[in-house]
């Protein structure tokens, strides 16, 4: 005789579906060494649409005492806002955001350098991008003392940190660039272009 599955009774007297029961059982097996609070935190992390008490994030939360929330409470009515994003993004997302930030900085610096090289353009034409320093900065509060920011040496520079010469020389030695005249593979194409005329003989 086939057995029929019944919905399991919830602790609060309600019923849960078999799928939710299986998820709870799986979480309890996977995180058996965690306390009740920790399991709720894991559930919230795994299912961001569910609050700690099991209610949907965009619905009316259930209360353990059965009373409704106060009238002035922002959770009394269903929220029409989209759910907020996770406060702890994944490492892939962090890396992507960092690359995007660096790429936008690089594109901005390249556009500024191109605008500086082409000059002001035609008289009726708007300037595509302003220079890095648009107005002098006042240092110390006195209107007479004016100094540019530390990183405003050149608009083509992305990072204005000084490079340590020892580190740079160790990279040159490590990459073998100090033996550039001895390595013919670094001079490929010299028949097509006259590179030797461009560089001083001491290099």
UniProtKB/Swiss-Prot annotation:
| Compositionally biased intervals (Low complexity) | 61-84
What does the entry give for GO biological process?
apoptotic process; brain development; labyrinthine layer development; melanin biosynthetic process; melanocyte differentiation; negative regulation of DNA-templated transcription; negative regulation of neuron apoptotic process; negative regulation of osteoblast differentiation
Which terms are listed as keywords in the entry? Activator, Apoptosis, Cytoplasm, Developmental protein, Differentiation, Nucleus, Phosphoprotein, Transcription, Transcription regulation
Q: In which tissues does this protein get expressed?
A: Expressed in calvarial osteoblasts. Expressed in nulliparous mammary epithelial cells; absent in pregnant mice and in lacting mammary glands. Also expressed in mammary tumors (at protein level). Expressed only in melanocytes and testis. Expressed at high levels in the strongly pigmented melanoma cells but at low levels in the weakly pigmented cells.
GO cellular component: a single term: nucleus
Explain what the UniProt record notes about the effect of disrupting the gene for this protein: Mice die shortly after birth. Mice show an abnormal placental development; the spongiotrophoblast layer is irregular in shape and enlarged while the labyrinthine layer is reduced in size, the blood spaces within the labyrinthine are disrupted. Produces more mineralized bone nodules and deposited twice as much calcium in the matrix.
Disordered: annotated segments: 1-24, 51-86
Question: How is the protein altered post-translationally, as described in the entry?
Answer: Phosphorylated. Phosphorylation changes in a cell cycle-dependent manner and reduces its transcriptional cofactor activity.
Chief location: nucleus
Q: What induces it?
A: Up-regulated by parathyroid hormone, forskolin and phorbol ester in osteoblasts.
Q: What superkingdom does the record give?
A: Eukaryota
Q: Where is this motif: Nuclear export signal?
A: 168-177
Places the protein is found: Nucleus; Cytoplasm
* GO MF assignments: chromatin binding; co-SMAD binding; LBD domain binding; protein homodimerization activity; transcription coactivator activity
Q: Which Pfam families match?
A: CITED
Entry's PANTHER family? CBP_P300-INTERACTING TRANSACTIVATOR 1 (PTHR17045:SF6), MELANOCYTE SPECIFIC GENE RELATED CITED (PTHR17045)
**Family indicated by similarity:** Belongs to the CITED family.
The free-text function statement in the UniProt record for this protein reads: Transcriptional coactivator of the p300/CBP-mediated transcription complex. Enhances SMAD-mediated transcription by strengthening the functional link between the DNA-binding SMAD transcription factors and the p300/CBP transcription coactivator complex. Stimulates estrogen-dependent transactivation activity mediated by estrogen receptors signaling; stabilizes the interaction of estrogen receptor ESR1 and histone acetyltransferase EP300. Positively regulates TGF-beta signaling through its association with the SMAD/p300/CBP-mediated transcriptional coactivator complex.
What is the protein's quaternary organization?
Homodimer. Binds to RBM14. Interacts (via N-terminus) with HSPA8; the interaction suppresses the association of CITED1 with p300/CBP and SMAD-mediated transcription transactivation. Interacts (via C-terminus) with TOX3 (via HGM box); the interaction increases estrogen-response element (ERE)-dependent transcription and protection against cell death. Interacts with ESR1; the interaction occurs in a estrogen-dependent manner. Interacts (unphosphorylated form preferentially and via C-terminus) with EP300. Interacts (via C-terminus) with CREBBP. Interacts with EGR2.
Q: What protein am I looking at?
A: Cbp/p300-interacting transactivator 1
Name its species. Answer: Mus musculus (Mouse)
The taxonomy runs:
Eukaryota, Metazoa, Chordata, Craniata, Vertebrata
| Gene behind this protein | Cited1
